[in-house]
Every structure is written in structure tokens, then in C-alpha cells.
Amino acid sequence: MTSYHSHPPKAYRRFESVCTQAPNAIAVVHEGKPVTYQQLQTQVLERSEALIRQGLADHPYMPLMANRCLEYLITMLACCKLGITYVSIEPSTPSKRLIAVLEQLGCNHLLLLGQPTDLRPDPTLTCFRLDDCGTLCSDGPALRQPIRRRLDDASVITVMFTSGTTGVPKGVRISQDGLLNLVDNVQQQVQGKPRSYVHHSSIGFDAALFEVWVPLLTGACVTLQPSEFNIDALDHCVRAASCDVLLLTTSLFHLVAQHRLSMLEAVRVLYVGGEVLKPVHARALLLANPRITLVNGYGPTENTVFSTWYSLNKPEDAERDVIPIGQFLHQVHGKIVDAKLQEVEVGTPGELLLTGANLALGYLDEALTPTRFLQLPEGTYYRTGDYVIQDEHGMLFYQGRIDEQVKIKGFRVEIAEVEHALTQLPGVAQAVVQAHVMNDLENSLHAFIVFRHGSPTIEESKLMSLLGDRLPHYMVPRRIHYLAELPLTANGKVDKRSLQPPEKAAVVSPQAGSAVLEIWSGILGTRNLQLEHSIYGYGASSLSVVMAHSRINEILGRTTPFDEVARLSTFQEWVQYYATHADPVTSLRSQHGNH
């Protein structure tokens, strides 16, 4: 048996230092219960010994399928102490994608935390759980022999999987140094004093690195928001925690700026990132909360969450057509190049290459690493695939993507991976996927497919179900459109500009539901809706539900609880729900009459 705990890595030594300096400070709040740094460290040491006893410390990777819970943080820190690279996996991950991830990791084991006791993602896996006494136990086949460690494995703190162009998710090897540099930059920006953070992002999303590691390595407190996305629950959590440092995806921030600005009253530093920040929403926040600093961040997972950022401190900072993505973090560097990798002049757009302390140590699949991590004379650079432009003051401005990568619900999606998954479905010969604007906050994916000649046509709902077994929810297209053949340009290439989602057939809606349907139509970008259909079949997301709930309540003058409408799935259910609470048609007409 091999033990790695006698020489813990840098990140864990930083955690130990915090525990020594402030043992009685609150480290974590979970379900209303505070845990001090001393208590947390004690549990981490116990978990480390449990991992060693089970033989897990001999393996370079520890896949964790977990909710946002205390046991997850304890295990994450224990892995860090032992030099094991932890891999966070969402419980909603489709089984085929889970197996693909584990195959890349070279292991057949999985640690389940905060899960139902009867959950078994796949019968071929060795599943570890905590019993009622907190003892780590396992079931299933024996562990595989540990795979050989790479020379730099000890420098990797976690692997985060992102969408891949080959149809297989890419594992990004995040380094200890990159994580610590992110922590140091944030600590300097928030002026060093202990703060209150909230962890609400998906554990498999790189934002979780910020939400968890920054507070735990700086002596701050992190409150765990355990439930699935629920705007009321997040609002309550942020307020109850007196959260003063918060990270939101840009799309979620835009939603909060429109409907829940009061949620951010106590926040002093708000980080946003993942998509283009709209000046109108930035200005609304800065007007409502003069004491807040809004940080517009930019960065791929391959460069550890944030590579550049731009701070806005007053409404005037947002009075511009485009908000910059700012300047490089300390010890992060980059250059803007043309197609031949030659640096361009100031004011000329080009592709951004990144290097420096935040740089990941390549991909888990070593064959993929040289396709994006370039060995240049001055060192290793990551090709972002992002067009940027730099002004004479050194400010960077995002200009768009070079390839077909898009952001859906804040997640990075490679169009090629979705198209590949579609062509693996029975009878599908060709597939083209495009992102279309759904409303002012969201994009959605539409798929256009051609079946092989003679193959039976499979219903859209069945195809959606099959895709859901292969892809995470945010990568499943909103709609699948059937074509006899794909349109071609004069050059014989697919004419993607002519592929537009068709309007649905008109619906005759009852008068009582016209207000609800009018609002949903605006959100989904579709004029005609079928009452009996699911809102999610039209591409609705959790953000869409928040928007609909807020707008309908605003029109009706109601304060209906979010958790009640979050359970509604069809348009008919929405109509019936609001018909029992108010007369939406009368209220809507009344409001329109006042304009």
C-alpha cells in the first residue's frame, strides 16, 4: 500500500495553514450547521485514513459523484492531502457519459456522496458509500489495478471534463499552481479579509473551483446551497449567509438584475463570467448597489476559471456599448495572433493565446493536448479559439468564436460533439446542430437530421430520450427537425444559414391562459404553443422558469412561491395554476391599458 499523506501538496499545506491560524473560524455552513476549520480538518484526516484503508490512495484518480454537501468537501480535501486527483461528477450525468469518463480515468470505482443509498449508476462499477455511521464501505466488483501515474500527476489537483469536438468529453488537468494563483488573485481583489461565499454551481463546472477553494484557502466561510437550481432557495441562501463575495454565470446575473436585484444587497464583490455581459444590466446593479464591485471575468477551463477581468465600480463604468473583459490576472500572460500564429498589432483582432501560472497541464487524453496546447519558443500556450482585440490602453474586448463552440445555460458546448451523438442514433445519416437565440437571456440548440434511406423514422421524443442517455441535459437540443436532405450551397457545403427552426402550428388557447401563454411565447421565442406540451420540449430551462414566474407575478401583482411553479411541466398546468390565483387576462389588459 502506498501512502502520500506525509508530504501533502501545496494546496493542502495552504489549507493546513489556515486551520492553524484560525481553528475556530467557521469554514463551512451546510443545512444551517456551522463547521469550524478545526472540525473540518479533523474530519479530513479521518477520511484520508479511510481512503487509504480501502486502497483508494493507490489510485491517481478519485471520481466523486456528489451533491453540494459537507461530505463532498471533506473527501475533496482528503484527496488533496493524499495527492489523489479528485474528479467531480454530477449525479445527473448520463450513464454512457459516466462510463466514458471513467474509462479515460482508467478506473472502475466511484464514490457516491449525498446520494440515495440504492443508487447504482452501472453494475460494472465498484461503488463506495458512507454508511449510517459514516464508515466508508463498498459493493460491486473488485477494484482494478491502479494505472501508472504520470510524472506530473502530483501537480494535478482535479480533472474537469468539458465538451469535446470528437464526441468524447475532454478531461482538463487543473494544476495546484493554477488553482493557488486564482486564489491569490481573488484574495488580493477582495482585499484579503475573510469573507462569506456561497457554493451554488454544479460541482462539475469550473465555477465550483472558485466557490469552494477560494474561501477554504483564505480562511473565509462557504455556505453550501444544497438543492437543485431554485431562485428562491439561492436568494434565501445568499441573504442568510450574508454573502459578500459571489460568482454568477452571466446569464444568471442578467436574470437576477432584471428580477432579483435585492438578492445582492449585501454582496460587495460580484464576479460574472461565461458569456458577454450586457451593459444595461451592469448599470442597473451599480445604480441599485453603490457599494458593490462588479467583476466581468473571462477565461476557459484550460486556464483555471479566470484569465482576465475588468472591474466596474460605478454606473458610469457601464455606459459603453461593449464592456471589456479587461486585463490579465497576476502571473497570467497572453498574446493575440493571426492564423499563422504571428502577433498582431494593437487594435487588430486575432486569436487569444494564454500562458502563465493558471495554465492547465494539458488533457487527460495526451493525444489531444498538442492540438490546443502549443509549444512555442517562449513556452506553452493554450489556443482559446476566441477572437479578441486590445485597445491602446491594454484593455481586451471579446469579439466572438473562431470555431463552432457555443455557450448553453452557461456551459461550454462543442457543436461537433452533439452532432456526433446524433449520428450514433438508429437510422440517422446526417446531423447539423445550430444555436439560435431563444430570448434576451438564453440560446438554445436546434438539430436538423436526415435519416438513412429505408430506415424507419423515429419519433422526436424517442430520439431525445436516447440523446439524454449520452449527453448532459444542457447539450440535448431543444428541438429535432426532420429533413429529406440537407440544403447545400453552390460550393457543395451545408447551407447552415437556411436552416431555421420552423414555427409550430397555431393553437387555439382558452381566454384564461392567454396571458401565461403570451409571456411564455416571448421567453421561448415561439409565437404559438401547444397547451398540452411540456415547456421543456420547447427548450425551457430553469432560467426560463424564473423569468416566466417573475414576469407573470409582476403582471398579476402576485407573490406566488417559486417552488410551486417549478413543479409545473406543461403549459396547461401553468394556465390552470394561475387561473386559481388570479385572472391573468384582466390583469394583463389592465396593465396594458395604463401604458
UniProtKB/Swiss-Prot annotation:
Protein name in UniProt: L-allo-isoleucine:holo-[CmaA peptidyl-carrier protein] ligase
SUPFAM superfamilies in UniProt: Acetyl-CoA synthetase-like, ACP-like
Cofactor binding summary note: Binds 1 phosphopantetheine covalently.
Organism of provenance: Pseudomonas savastanoi pv. glycinea
Modified residues (O-(pantetheine 4'-phosphoryl)serine): S542
GO terms under cellular component: cytoplasm
Subunit annotation: Homodimer.
GO BP, sorted A to Z: amino acid activation for nonribosomal peptide biosynthetic process; response to microbial phytotoxin; secondary metabolite biosynthetic process
UniProt keyword annotations, A-Z: Ligase, Phosphopantetheine, Phosphoprotein, Plasmid, Virulence
UniProt note: domains: The didomain protein contains an adenylation domain (A domain) and a thiolation domain (T domain).
Carrier domain segment(s): 507-582
Enzyme class at the top of the EC tree: ligase
Cofactor: pantetheine 4'-phosphate
Function: Involved in the biosynthesis of the phytotoxin coronatine (COR) which mimics the plant hormone jasmonic acid isoleucine and promotes opening of stomata for bacterial entry, bacterial growth in the apoplast, systemic susceptibility, and disease symptoms. CmaA catalyzes the adenylation of L-allo-isoleucine (via the A domain) and the attachment of L-allo-isoleucine to the 4'-phosphopantetheine arm located within the T domain of CmaA. It can also use L-isoleucine, L-leucine and L-valine as substrates.
GO molecular function terms listed in the Swiss-Prot or TrEMBL record: acid-thiol ligase activity; phosphopantetheine binding
Homology family: Belongs to the ATP-dependent AMP-binding enzyme family.
Pfam families referenced in this protein's UniProt entry, alphabetically: AMP-binding, AMP-binding_C, PP-binding
